[in-house]
Amino acid sequence: MPKPSLTFFCEMDGIALAALFQDGQVLTSLKKLGANLSLGMLDLSEKRAEVVKKLNRAGVPVTAWLLLSKERGYWTSLDTVQETAQQYGEFKQWQEKYKLAFAAIGLDIEPRIEIMSALSKNPGRETLSLLKRFIVSSDPLDFENEAHALIDHIRSDGYAVETYQFPLIVDERMARSHVLLKTLGLPSLNSDREVLMLYSSFFPVQADSLLWSYAKEAQAVGVGSTGGGVEIAGMPPLKTLRWIDLKRDLLLASKAVKHVYIFSLEGCVQNRYMDRLCNLNWQTEVLPPEKPAAGIWIIRRLFQGLMWAFSHPFDAILGILLVNTVWNFLRRITRA
């Protein structure tokens, strides 16, 4: 299988980022891999600008991964699309001030960070809160239109747009559902590249089967985690992948997509995976878990049906009544 295009996520503050790139070894590894960097904009500091300049001079393509402060929700969703638009404006001023070059803009589509924290601390109570939100929330179309308008605005500035999505967005789309949209504020956006975050660290059981099930339907795949990332109150950190598991996920993903993203650069450096990545034989044979993935697909289809029913309750009720009527009619004919 051919070597895919690799992109590393990096989510560090300006001081830690400057230290990571201080000796030039990380930059050398990125160049050797021909890799891109999706750089989380945790701040718009001079130190971050200096690192971007190093990457520009070395010819390493950089994506500006837009992030908010924790107080503003941290990630992009329908709840924070206005804040993300404001952050993009501030980013543009910073980029122009330091004359920096970026290949794309990344939007991380996740719920507000306090929702993630609440789901971890008290899942029962927060689930009820989200169910109430689904029932009583107004039409999210206006906010969804704002998200599409933001993407159009970014494109008009000459940037490609990447979106980083939970894999469930694929099921929502296939089910023609709006459950994730109305509960968690997660829109399905028409970006230039959608990256499904298929981190085995999220799924301790059947991780490879889940990855394979979704990867075959993806434009690009994110694997990990090798460490790093934001701390969420009440939520334990993601389990760090062993090299053997990261290698498996990379090889599996490369059989399905041409673009693979690794979370995170700092984790790979800390765990001394960079040299192994540089020397990885992409022709190494790996057997896709077809049978377990088929089981995952059945579960996904059932879940999609449930999402459709929640999103179209009247249609679902009419369908049940119709099936019941036909069934009773057939029973009468059989008895006669």
Segments from the language model and where they lie:
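Catalytic domains of carbohydrate-active enzymes, especially glycoside hydrolases
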Residues: P4-F8, G14-E46, K97-I105, P187-E194, ...
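Active-site groove signature of glycoside hydrolases
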Residues: E90-S137, V260-I262
